[in-house]
C-alpha cells in the first residue's frame, strides 16, 4: 500500500500562530531551561512546593520525561507520574480543583479538555512539542478539507484545535486496533502527525493511510547504523524502542512500546542490560523499577552527525522546581482552551475511550504499543 505524505517543518517561524510562539525553536527552548541547582536549593524548593500544593489544594501530574525531582514530588504528594492521557484522566478523576501539569503544552490542553471546570497550570507555557508544532491547525484543516472522504485519526501529541478536526484520537496502544477496526469497515484514513508511528501501524494493518509527515525531535534522532554497532558491543542487552523512532531503529527492537510498557519490560525481563531508544528522562523510573540493571542510551549521532535533542526533549527540560514553585505562588501560566474547540476535541477523545472500554484495553498516550517480539509476551499493560 502506497503511503502518501504531507510535510510541514516544525521550526519554521512563519508557520506558527501567535499562540505557538515562544520556545518554538530548539535553541530557544534550551536557552529557557532553568539552571542546575545545588542540593540545598533543591531541597528548599521541594519543601516550599509541598507546602504550596497543600495550600492551593492542588495536585501535581508529571510526565516520565520531566526532571526526576518533579517525578518524585508528584508521587510524594499524591499526584501522578505517567503518560499524557493517563495524566489527564488522573486529573479528571482527582478531587483537586487545580491541576499542575509538568510536561508539554498539549498535555495541559488535554487535561483541560477532560476537566474544563478545573484550573490547569503549567510551569512554562512555552513548553511545546515538535509533533504539535509540525501540525499547524490551519494547515491541517486545509489538508482535511482537501480529503473529505477520509476518516481523520490523530495522535495524542497534537493541539486542541487539531483534535477538534479529528474523528478519532488514538494512543499507540489502541491505535492499531482502531485502525484495524476502521480498515475492516473500508475506511480510508488521514493520519497525523507522527510519520514513524503511522508507518508502523500502516504496515501492521495494511490500511490506506494518507500521512502527515511529522516527527518527534527526540525519537527522530536515533540512528539505526550506530544502534547496530552499539548492540555488537553489548550482545546480551535487550533493545527497548519507542514507536516514534525511525524504522531502522524499530526493526532492531526486542521490545517496542510506550514509556509505561518499556518500564514494565525493564522490570520484568531477565536481561541485566538494556539499550533504550526514547527520551532519557525515562531512565529515572527504569532504575527505580529495576534496581541493579544497567541502562544505556541509544545513539542519537553518528559519524559527522550532531543531535539537537541528544535523547532529551528541550521542552520537557523547561519544567523545573523553580518555575513550578513560581506558578504555585502566583497562579500564572493557566491553560485555556476555547470552549467551542474543547467541546469538539473531546468527541474524538471520548470515542477512543469508549472503544477502549469495549475492547477492555488499558489506554495510555505516547505510544502504548504491543511489542513486536516474543520477549514481551506475558507482560501486561503498565
From Swiss-Prot:
Superkingdom of this protein's organism: Bacteria
Gene Ontology BP terms: 'de novo' NAD biosynthetic process from L-aspartate
Protein name, per record: Quinolinate synthase
Cofactor binding: number and manner: Binds 1 [4Fe-4S] cluster per subunit.
Residue numbers binding iminosuccinate: 63, 84, 155-157, 172, 242-244, 259
Protein family (similarity comment): Belongs to the quinolinate synthase family. Type 1 subfamily.
Reaction(s) the record says it catalyses: iminosuccinate + dihydroxyacetone phosphate = quinolinate + phosphate + 2 H2O + H(+)
Cofactor(s) needed by this chain: [4Fe-4S] cluster
Cellular compartment(s): Cytoplasm
PANTHER family membership: QUINOLINATE SYNTHASE, CHLOROPLASTIC, QUINOLINATE SYNTHETASE A
Broad EC category: transferase
GO terms for cellular component: cytosol
UniProt KW keywords: 4Fe-4S, Cytoplasm, Iron, Iron-sulfur, Metal-binding, Pyridine nucleotide biosynthesis, Transferase
Span of the signal peptide: none
The keyword Acyltransferase appears for this protein: no
Residues reported to bind [4Fe-4S] cluster: 129, 216, 313
Biological function: Catalyzes the condensation of iminoaspartate with dihydroxyacetone phosphate to form quinolinate.
Gene Ontology molecular function: 4 iron, 4 sulfur cluster binding; metal ion binding; quinolinate synthetase A activity
Entry EC no(s): 2.5.1.72
Organism phylogeny: Bacteria, Pseudomonadati, Pseudomonadota, Betaproteobacteria, Burkholderiales
Pathway(s) per entry: Cofactor biosynthesis; NAD(+) biosynthesis; quinolinate from iminoaspartate: step 1/1
